[in-house]
């Protein structure tokens, strides 16, 4: 377990490891020269728990890699795991991993990690497809998708395997050190046992005064660190002749990292965007055609636009393509030979894959206008044609779900029929009952489009930005008398809704608005 200036959480992390039971021979807590009393707190715990050993570093290492290496050096048990001071191990995690490793004589055992949003407690599984069922992988090249899970903390490693292959973390100030460590593990071709059990809880504190590395993406240094770590990981795999894994890693970069940062580009300043674009182009130029072809279409398109354009462009449209699910908003251009293309002036970025892509994967664009009103709330949807595919499928109906983002539950469900309009457009309108929402919250608008040919597409609506649309409106509430509702656009441009029930909620928003005006 490693920690630095995390006195508020370190005891919970240590206790979660000790609570795993007799399978845990020793917990080695490496304090990276904390200044907030974390070291003394750990010493106090160690005085009462013989299985806890505390290592005090004399100088701060600047990263997570060096203290983890210290732990590897001190480990005397046959197996080792890693834990961060602000996370926890759920009950039974070690037993699940250790049991699989022993039963299958595996050098590495891995299980499911969940990202737990705090304070809401909402959990999102990390790479759940890998851990849907128990399995044994004789060598990683037989399952290239393993490169998608770059985490080091949801795995148990045989200590002699790490030492025999000299597998360590990058030392010093090296962000995304787990990218490199995981590549070194996979390059050593371990026998791996995968379990469906949840073995790690990754705490996500978006409101924290100091953001974690994975959340602190505002500066260009974070993106450069990610590029450097990914480049080094790919080089490690290629040096070990793991070409399939290297290709899968590059394809995953396009689908995950590139899409994630592209969704946030229009939140940054002009200088950041220009710098980001230049650095990203330089890295993507090291990819070959097969790397792009191996990636899912949205990331492939985003990457090709960046390569084709010397300067940042079309950021709002790129953001929508990078969304999950992807949305390709107008205009819909063609190359001179009639091939669908990103734009008339970038005909080399072809979109011909859209002509044969299954409807359930087609990045259809649906504009959404949510209008909260005292006499009833209406959601108007406008479905766009996409190179003839939508008309051929025949839009019929749309299911609209209002989903509680905190708990992932559907609180309202509506269905409406599409009506054809001129210019290859279809519209549908549903009524939503906002008065039934009984607490402050954030609500996602999710759609399922049904077509005459029997196909369907799950989608989100593009939040239309026009005067009077994305603003706060007070509407009646059966529970609280009044409800403050605000439709808004998420980072990816999708339509969502925030609510603040009751007079107190309205007053809070009014005070915040007044404070902003005064400052």
Please annotate each region the language model reported:
Residues 7, 263-267:
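Short acidic, S/G/P-rich loop/turn micro-motifs used as interaction or catalytic elements
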Residues 17, 21, 46, 230-237, ...:
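Hydrophobic, Leu/Ile/Phe/Ala-enriched alpha-helical segments that form helix-helix packing faces
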Residues 245-259:
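Amphipathic alpha-helical protein-interaction segments enriched in hydrophobic
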Residues 267-519:
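Basic, ligand-binding patches in group-transfer machinery
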Residues 197-205, 211-244, 257, 267-287:
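Catalytic core of nucleotide-sugar-dependent glycosyltransferases
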Residues 255-263, 303-308:
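Short, hydrophobic/amphipathic alpha-helical patches that form generic packing surfaces
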Residues 1-224:
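Nucleotide-sugar donor-binding/catalytic module of glycosyltransferases
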Residues 182, 230, 250-254:
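Short runs of predominantly hydrophobic/aromatic residues within well-ordered alpha helices
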């Amino acid at each position: 377990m490693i920690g630095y200036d995390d006195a508020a959480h370190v005891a919970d992390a240590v206790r979660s490891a000790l609570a795993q039971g007799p399978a845990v021979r020793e917990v080695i807590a490496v304090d990276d020269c904390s200044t907030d009393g974390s070291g003394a707190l750990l010493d106090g715990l160690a005085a009462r728990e013989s299985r806890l050993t505390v290592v005090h570093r004399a100088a701060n290492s600047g990263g997570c890699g060096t203290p983890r290496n210290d732990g590897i050096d001190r480990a005397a048990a046959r197996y080792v795991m890693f834990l961060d001071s602000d996370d926890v191990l759920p009950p039974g995690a070690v037993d699940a991993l250790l049991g699989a490793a022993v039963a299958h004589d595996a050098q590495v055992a891995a299980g499911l990690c969940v990202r737990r949003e705090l304070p809401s407690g909402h959990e999102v599984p990390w790479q759940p497809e890998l851990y849907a069922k128990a399995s044994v992988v004789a060598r990683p090249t037989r399952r290239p998708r393993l490169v998608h899970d770059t985490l080091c903390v949801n795995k148990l490693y045989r200590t002699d395997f790490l030492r025999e292959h000299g597998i360590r973390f990058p030392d010093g100030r090296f962000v995304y050190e787990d990218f490199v460590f995981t590549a070194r593990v996979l390059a050593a071709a371990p026998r791996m046992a995968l379990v469906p059990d949840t073995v790690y809880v990754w705490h996500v504190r978006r409101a924290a005064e100091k953001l974690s590395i994975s959340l602190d993406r505002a500066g260009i240094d974070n993106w450069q660190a990610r590029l450097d770590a990914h480049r080094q990981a790919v080089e490690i795999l290629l040096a070990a002749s793991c070409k399939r894994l290297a290709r899968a890693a590059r394809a995953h970069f396009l689908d995950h990292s590139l899409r994630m940062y592209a969704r946030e580009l229009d939140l940054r300043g002009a200088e950041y965007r220009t710098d980001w674009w230049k650095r990203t182009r330089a890295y993507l130029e090291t990819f070959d055609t097969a790397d792009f072809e191996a990636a899912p279409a949205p990331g492939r398109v985003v990457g090709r636009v960046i390569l084709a354009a010397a300067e940042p462009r079309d950021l709002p449209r790129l953001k929508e393509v990078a969304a999950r699910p992807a949305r390709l908003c107008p205009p819909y251009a063609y190359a001179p030979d009639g091939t669908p293309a990103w734009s008339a002036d970038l005909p080399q970025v072809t979109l011909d894959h859209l002509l044969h892509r299954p409807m359930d994967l087609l990045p259809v664009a649906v504009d959404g206008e949510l209008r909260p009103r005292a006499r009833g709330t209406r959601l108007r949807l406008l479905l766009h044609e996409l190179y003839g595919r939508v008309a051929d499928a025949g839009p019929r109906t749309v299911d609209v779900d209002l989903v509680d983002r905190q708990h992932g539950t559907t609180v309202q469900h509506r269905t409406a029929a599409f009506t054809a309009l001129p210019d290859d457009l279809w519209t549908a309108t549903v009524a939503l009952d906002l008065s039934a929402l009984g607490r402050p919250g954030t609500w996602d608008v999710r759609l399922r489009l049904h077509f005459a040919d029997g196909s369907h597409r799950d989608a989100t609506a593009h939040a239309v930005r026009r005067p009077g649309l994305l603003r706060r409106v007070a509407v009646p509430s059966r529970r609280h008398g009044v409800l403050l509702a605000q439709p808004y656009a998420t980072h990816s441009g999708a339509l969502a809704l925030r609510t603040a029930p009751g007079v107190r909620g309205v007053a809070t928003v009014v005070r915040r608005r007044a404070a902003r005006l005064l400052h």
